[in-house]
Amino acid sequence: MRSRRAPTIVDAALTLGAHHAVAMPTRRGYVPAMGETSLMTAEELLRLNLPDKRTELIRGRLVVRDPGGARHGAVAMQLGYRIMAHAEAHDLGRVYAAETGFKLESDPDTVRAPDVAFIAKHRVPEVEPRGYAGWAPDLAVEVLAHDDHPAETLEKIAQWLKAGVRLVWVVDSEQRTARVYRADGSEALLGTNETLDGEDVLPGFRCPLADLW
């Protein structure tokens, strides 16, 4: 496992995002430029009806994407199942499925949806809202799709960490690797023969990357 200290990832990525005011067409969707349309709130996003689409909000800007591909879905499901089985067996907390929205910022609003999320038991509310979660998960898992842009992925990781996520896993099924990002700014690159470790966020959890492919 190759580790290095990366204390500036959050600031660098958020600075990139703050100056990214031009429209960004992608194969999956379209991010309108600032000023091209009025900013949307989390409440408006929740009421939006776009069947068979994946939506997020980035500082008030709507992102609309098509569903992920088969490999993306299979890897996300495989890892999510393993996380849920471990969390339930050890009464560690709650696991959330793909596309569960978490409101990370307000005025303008940011709503992100990871492929898998975990929240420690002591942080799970007695009554969960029907709308977006108003808190950040402890673990956020992102499974890269073939059209994910590196700069957009970096910005998303930075937003997770800034919001209080303690551990982020970014799984690349094409390269058969995973990157681990921690709240202290450190990160690690794992090869296909290495193992994801839940560390102190998901104690006792270990998943060989090779089992996901």
Residue spans of the language-model regions?
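Catalytic toxin/effector domains delivered as secreted proteins or via bacterial secretion systems
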Residues: 1
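Gly/Pro/Ser/Thr-rich low-complexity, intrinsically disordered segments predominantly at protein N-termini
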Residues: 8-213
